[in-house]
């Protein structure tokens, strides 16, 4: 959608282990911990950071979803703060997380605010979608 801005730290193409080509070409190359946008730019931000640390450097999952960093709790807190910074005063943050290696309850503690609501989905209900209001942060 031309109204959306896709930001990712990666800009790459690779061939996955099953032979498929993966292309990641964001509109903006940037780190979610230090976004290249002015304060109060967006009404809605979707934050879907890499959630896995224990991955091989060339694994399918690392290429497709990205690999988290060793200081992920600090990075996730910084990412949440950046999302709130770029949101307009009544903005909404949609956060997607998979609980395979860290529970969503831990993420909520890291963020320091409860979501307005959430929804579990995916295999074994490990994927969580959460909605946060900037005004509650």
Label the predicted regions.
Residues 1-137:
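Class I S-adenosyl-L-methionine-dependent methyltransferase catalytic core
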């Amino acid at each position: 959608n031309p109204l959306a801005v896709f930001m990712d730290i990666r800009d790459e193409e690779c061939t996955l282990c099953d032979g498929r080509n993966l292309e990641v070409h964001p509109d903006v190359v940037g780190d979610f911990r230090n976004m290249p946008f002015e304060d109060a730019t967006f009404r809605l931000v979707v934050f879907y950071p890499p959630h896995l640390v224990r991955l091989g450097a060339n694994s399918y999952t690392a290429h497709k979803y990205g690999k988290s960093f060793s200081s992920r709790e600090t990075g996730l807190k910084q990412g949440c703060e950046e999302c709130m910074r770029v949101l307009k005063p009544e903005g909404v943050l949609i956060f997607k997380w998979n609980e395979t290696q860290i529970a969503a309850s831990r993420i909520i503690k890291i963020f320091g605010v409860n979501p307005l609501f959430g929804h579990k989905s995916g295999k074994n209900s490990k994927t969580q979608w959460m909605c946060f209001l900037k005004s509650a942060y």
